[in-house]
């Protein structure tokens, strides 16, 4: 160890020695170790080559290091007409192109068209007849005569055609059209001379009349559609033939008579729809059927209505009708009465069987095995070696008395039951 005076300057010997210098350790900082910035908010700032990465790596990195995006509300696509909700636009598009949506849409449009107020037919006729002549077509040639002053808005009507032409539309005599023509003639007589019939203006005359006829037909069709409904039965039909068939049917007559529900159709049961009157209504209501009431097939004695003469003959030859003629009371052929009879018979049979069983058990219990059981076992053990059934007077008398079981049942057979064997010793336990 070298000792020297303590001085501020280093000694030359120490300066000549090469000592390893200790590196200064700054505080540990992750920012110097990592190749990316920690303060970045997007994966692009963390990874410089993010744009050149594989799409799968991009998705993983953006899912791991990316900023969580705010939750987006899921958009629901729904159909208000069919009351359905879809998960995607493809499902919605397929539904809108389908038959179900088209049918619902047609039904809604039909209901809306029925709810719209209908204009009166007279106003439609006046407008349709007055509008075409007012707006003259540019292609029609004008007459060469002097131009007459224009008529008022209420007087701009097509001139009446020549009666020799025989127009079927105007020969019908529309009252509104005739009144307007009279008013036009009376008012224009003082203001302008009567105009000569112009062929260019006569041409569009029948068209508005035809339009008026068409609108009248449409109005009648709508009214007829509104009438295809039976308020009594609350039934709507599609055509007049269906409505007529419904009015002649049994259900409609049943509801008209004031009954509730549908008529019962029972075979052989009395029907409360009436006799002669019912048949008369049915024949009159039929289209092109026989006129006059048909003969009623009715048995007054049995209060029964049938449909044909053959059924009436079969009823007359039946036992039910003959019993009524003989004065016998009617037999109730209901299933309830039959079941009651069967159950009563079965109960009586069971009661008799139970009584017999009780009596037999009492008799056997009183007469069977009168002595104690050890005495009977000792008597059996006292029998000889071969097991042969021999009549024993005392045993037979004690075990089976004469009135119940006679000794003839216990006769010994001709030979032994089995070959001779050694003696058997009965040892309980």
Swiss-Prot record:
The stretches annotated as zinc fingers (Matrin-type) lie at 77-107, 225-259, 297-327
**What's a Pfam family this protein contains?**
zf-met
Q: What name does this protein carry? A: Zinc finger protein 385C
Q: Which UniProt keywords apply?
A: Metal-binding, Nucleus, Repeat, Zinc, Zinc-finger
- One MF term in the entry's GO annotations: zinc ion binding
Bias kind Pro residues: ranges: 147-162
Biased segments, Basic residues type: 262-284
- Alphabetical list of InterPro entries matching this protein: Matrin/U1-like-C_Znf_C2H2 (IPR003604), Znf385 (IPR051845), Znf_C2H2_sf (IPR036236), Znf_C2H2_type (IPR013087)
Which residues form each disulfide bond in the chain? Answer: none
Lineage, highest ranks first: Eukaryota, Metazoa, Chordata, Craniata, Vertebrata
Region of interest called Disordered, as start-end residue ranges on this chain: 109-224, 258-295, 311-340
Q: Please note every region of biased composition (Low complexity).
A: 125-146, 181-193
Q: Where does this polypeptide localize?
A: Nucleus
**CC per GO annotation:** nucleus
């Amino acid at each position: 160890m070298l000792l020297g005076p303590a001085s501020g300057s280093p000694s030359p010997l120490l300066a000549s020695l090469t000592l390893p210098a200790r590196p200064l350790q700054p505080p540990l900082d992750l920012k110097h170790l990592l190749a990316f910035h920690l303060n970045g908010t997007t994966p692009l700032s963390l990874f410089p080559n993010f744009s050149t990465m594989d799409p799968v790596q991009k998705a993983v990195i953006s899912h791991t290091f990316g900023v969580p995006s705010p939750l987006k509300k899921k958009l629901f696509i729904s159909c208000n007409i069919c009351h359905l909700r879809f998960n995607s636009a493809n499902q919605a598009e397929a539904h809108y192109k389908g038959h179900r949506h088209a049918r619902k849409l047609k039904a809604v449009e039909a209901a809306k068209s029925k709810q719209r107020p209908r204009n009166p037919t007279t106003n439609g006729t006046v407008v349709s007849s007055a509008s075409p002549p007012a707006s003259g077509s540019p292609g029609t040639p004008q007459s060469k005569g002097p131009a007459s002053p224009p008529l008022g808005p209420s007087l701009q009507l097509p001139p009446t055609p020549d009666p020799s032409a025989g127009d079927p539309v105007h020969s019908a005599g529309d009252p509104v059209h005739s009144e307007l023509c009279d008013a036009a003639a009376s008012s224009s007589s003082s203001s302008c001379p009567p105009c000569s019939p112009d062929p260019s203006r006569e041409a569009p005359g029948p068209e508005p009349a035809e339009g008026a006829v068409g609108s009248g037909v449409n109005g009648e069709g709508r009214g007829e559609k509104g009438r295809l409904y039976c308020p009594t039965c609350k039934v709507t039909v599609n055509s007049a033939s269906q409505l007529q068939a419904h009015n002649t049917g049994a259900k409609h007559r049943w509801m008209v008579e004031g009954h509730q529900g549908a008529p019962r159709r029972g075979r052989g049961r009395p029907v409360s729809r009436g006799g002669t009157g019912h048949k008369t209504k049915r024949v009159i209501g039929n289209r092109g059927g026989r006129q006059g009431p048909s003969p009623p097939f009715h048995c007054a004695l049995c209060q029964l209505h049938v449909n044909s003469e053959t059924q009436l003959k079969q009823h007359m030859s039946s036992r039910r009708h003959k019993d009524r003629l003989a004065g016998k009371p009617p037999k109730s052929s209901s299933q309830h009465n039959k079941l009651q009879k069967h159950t009563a018979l079965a109960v009586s049979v069971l009661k008799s069987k139970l009584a017999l069983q009780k009596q037999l058990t009492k008799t056997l219990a009183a007469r069977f095995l009168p002595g104690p059981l050890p005495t009977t076992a000792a008597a059996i053990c006292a029998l000889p070696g071969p097991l042969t059934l021999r009549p024993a007077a005392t045993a037979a008398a004690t075990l089976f008395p004469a009135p119940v079981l006679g000794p003839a049942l216990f006769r010994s057979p001709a030979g032994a039951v089995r070959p001779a064997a050694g003696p058997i010793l009965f040892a309980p336990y």
